[in-house]
């Protein structure tokens, strides 16, 4: 007897329909074809034990299972449940006349309990597109799949539940998720708030500009200046995610199995990988590609603390994702693309010792140490960071001040208002949501300068030897500053402020070796051997 059961395979962040054909005929043997991986090939042992422990058995006949399309590789143990049901239905042990109306996924334990899977949300989205009436999956994954409207999602915990459902002995209730309630969660009780930060008004201004325009930012300052504290509070001033952004973010986390017992991810992600991370872990990849940290930070913030401590090769692989807002992983037989539209927030000490330019420190780096330290960050990578800002230690008077600081909620209102201006501006550009995403043509259109502003920018370009990409960055930041003030045109004072936020373009940070030799000798600093 031939039975068809339907499952799904996740490829990138999208799902594809898998047809599982189970045929039982005379003879002996268990034959599984259709490019299954080892986890699927081992499923017969899990299925046999699970069936035995609930009073069923594998038929003593020849079982042939085909997983179509046969040219698409199938991975993981999530096919245990549809395989088991297909065998039971094909052998006549259960009656399942409507089994072809459902997508079925789940891993079986030896006692018949059902374990969670990865990629439930993209599978549910594809199931709706393919016209299925329902989706049976582990109860731990039910909430994320139930985000998809007009699809009945049933969470199950044991194989017997599913058998009773198809035998019409037990009714299952669809899981319902209140999307509006999920969205309300993001504005309640933020873990970090800018009101916790004493002083640093100038840096808070930079963070506000970065949030308003989606600009990448690097914070440069000595240890204890508050760089990490400021970075962790950036998500609290970003505008709330819309439904499309929340779905995109949840899909990525779902593929990695990070959404168990949760519904929609409605809070912008904040990812802070350790500096020992590999390039594959950062951007994604592997023999069977998985999203990396930059995709996990999609629609949120990626924080790289102590940027020069990362391997240069790791930092360089970020150049393409920073520009294209997506990461493409190519293999011989396929290509996978993951979304990676994130805000990069990086921090670094100004020198290996952490106290370069500190007038109170008598221990400074040698010129060789300084060049080696700064050489880990390439010019092309820095060009892709819109805002470079120096963070100075907070004086005691500010730390001991008992007056209340401005809250994240207050800053977020201004940021949201600026984003609304950008939404109206880019209505005709569906792939652009904020100023940082503008290309050269759009910069020329929306960042027109008067003669005063143009002359000011020309002088800055010549004196700082800025690249064409840095020129575009300054214009984007100036446009955001104007949006925060609800100004129609970019003025010279907007340009002047934006130029200030290019610290690493100035001599003294990325200057010649002779500068550091001159600096260390003039300060009388003791040079450390490299």
What does each model-identified segment do?
Residues 1-218, 222-228, 330, 470-471, ...:
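Peripheral, non-AAA+ core regions of ATP-driven protein-machinery
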Residues 18-24, 282, 386-389:
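Short beta-strand elements
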Residues 39-44, 59, 66-76, 288-289, ...:
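Basic, amphipathic alpha-helical bundle interface domains used for macromolecular binding and assembly
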Residues 170-209, 213, 240-294:
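P-loop NTPase nucleotide-binding/switch module
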Residues 219-258, 324:
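Walker A/P-loop
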Residues 221, 284, 306:
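The Walker A (P-loop) glycine that initiates the GxxxxGKT/S ATP-binding motif of P-loop NTPases
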Residues 299, 305-306, 317:
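Walker B catalytic acidic pair
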